[in-house]
Amino acid sequence: MTITHQQRRRLAMALLVLTIAVTVSRLRAQNIAPSASAALSSSVVANTDQTSTQQPGADIPPQPGPKQLTNFVEAGGDYLNLSNRFGRWVGGYGRGTVTTGNNIWNGEVNGQHEFGDAGVYMGAGDTYTFNSDWYGSLTVGSSVGGFFWPRFRTDGFINKKWMSRKQLITTFGLGYYAAKDAHRDHSFFLGSTYYFAKPWIVEEGIRFNVSNPGSVFSPAAFVAVTHGRNKQNYVTVRTGFGKEAFQLIGPTVSLSDFQSQTLSVTWRQWIGTDWGVNFVGDYYHSPFYQRGGTTLGFFREF
């Protein structure tokens, strides 16, 4: 039986809604009280961005920070316009985390319509604290539909805290990305995060990526600055820049070997003691098109 494009879109969106509902109900069943000392790092703020995380490029996927907003669910949607007749991107997402012992479990479902196709990405991971100085994380993900989503991706990171207040964190990571065509990417990441005594966090990192076929070297870097306090608000400004080995714009069509830049501003605002809104403004530039838009989500802590 042949499935039409419209039927694929409906199936993808139905799967997204169903998965979000199941995730929320399971998190409610956990009935885990939020930690009074939980704080939000720039990594977690940046992780709310919806800026083209489906393909490796100048926007490096953020890593879990040492102090995260935990035991929460969030759901929202995004709308972005593209220049040069590339259309628009529209989608919705659901994500959440639960803490059990030394583990912080996280899950994500993201349904998008891009470049005339639709699909749903699903990912899960764990951040594990080994001791007061070391913690690591591992995430895996795959997708249904959507040529622009990865067939499979995984990222692993190990982090070390330094100095008297443990205010400096260094990060080392490895990643693997399998697109739905022949492209396969292997990456190596180095980064650091510094927590100032006042409510400022500075994060930077660089990813060295090799894409095959062709062994195309495509390094990319980012810098992020966060200001704010837990249970009040956080504002993060994040910029990324570097080289993209490829970007799929169709099942058999790709842009290749070009420079791109990204800029995002994230505002996470608590409205009540355990809930609030998350707003993201995104901008992307490449020689082929520009992209700009917003993401709006609502979160609830447990």
PLM features per residue range, with description:
Residues 160-246:
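Detector for outer-membrane/organellar transmembrane beta-barrel domains
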Residues 96-100, 128, 160-162, 194, ...:
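Residue-level signature of outer-membrane beta-barrel architecture
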Residues 225, 291-302:
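Outer-membrane beta-barrel "beta-signal"
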Residues 32-38, 43-123, 127-129, 151, ...:
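Outer-membrane beta-barrel initiation region
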Residues 80-90, 111-120, 142-153, 177-186, ...:
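Solvent-exposed loop/turn segments connecting transmembrane beta-strands
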Residues 144-146, 224-226, 230-276:
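Outer membrane beta-barrel transmembrane domains
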Residues 73-79, 107-111, 124-126, 138-142, ...:
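Transmembrane beta-barrel strands of outer-membrane/channel proteins
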Residues 71, 101-107, 132-138, 164-171, ...:
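Repeated loop/turn-to-beta-strand initiation elements of outer-membrane beta-barrel proteins
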